[in-house]
Amino acid sequence: MDAAGLAEQITELLQLCRLLWIAIEHRDGWAAFAHWIVILLHCRARKEFFVAEPIPFRCNFMTRKVYLAGPEVFLPNAREILDRKAALAREAGLLPLSPGDLEIPHTNSKRERAAAINAVDEKMMIQADAIIANLTPFRGIAADTGTAFELGFMCASGKPVFAYTNVARDHSGRVSDLYGGAVAYDAEGRLRDPNGIAVEDFGLADNLMLHAGIERRGGVLIIGDAARDALYTDLAAFKTCLAVAVEKLR
């Protein structure tokens, strides 16, 4: 066994010891401990790394776990913003799971590290009961692609999905802005860009597979309107989305 494999086994053992202690301390903890044993065995069978999400000292194991997705992980003050969102989720009675919360196992290459991050994030989504996704346009006119994947993952898993954006202008409006207003309707009434490529024109916040996919499942996409210099730090829309999620998850 190499050093990385030994480190993974030690990490798994420490997490199981922590969960066992919580199970002993809390009346309803044994069900949660059994749940994690099943997940560990599943991971072993698939040769995947076992991850148990952080559990507060005093927790209710019936608390809904919500995966907080968004491009905040790329910000220079990522830890600050992620911690603020997590604190708000806890105050609302939810247990937050967020990319960046857990240590990534050691790898030997960038490609392996990318795969390890993907595995950890997907494991958290499997453990989560719902998702709140930040669909604020990122590095372009559309939502962060990683967040879009995570939203689709949770939709496909049949779990409750909620989202918000800090940009009020809809998708077609942002495409128009990208081309300096040079979009127009053709003879058949289809909106097209200067290259003749059709533009989605449904009045939605983003691609219809995201916005409509959320609403078809009973979720909501909250539309905020943050200042340009606070697109990824303004949490007003997140708070509104969080309140809706709490109500619907009861």
State where each predicted segment sits:
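Hydrophobic, low-acid, alpha-helix-prone terminal segments
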Residues: 6-17, 27
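Short linear/disordered segments characteristic of secreted peptide precursors
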Residues: 8, 26-31, 44-46
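Aromatic (phenylalanine/tyrosine) cluster motif
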Residues: 33, 49-50, 57, 61
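Conserved catalytic or regulatory cores that recognize and/or transform ribose-phosphate-containing ligands
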Residues: 56-250
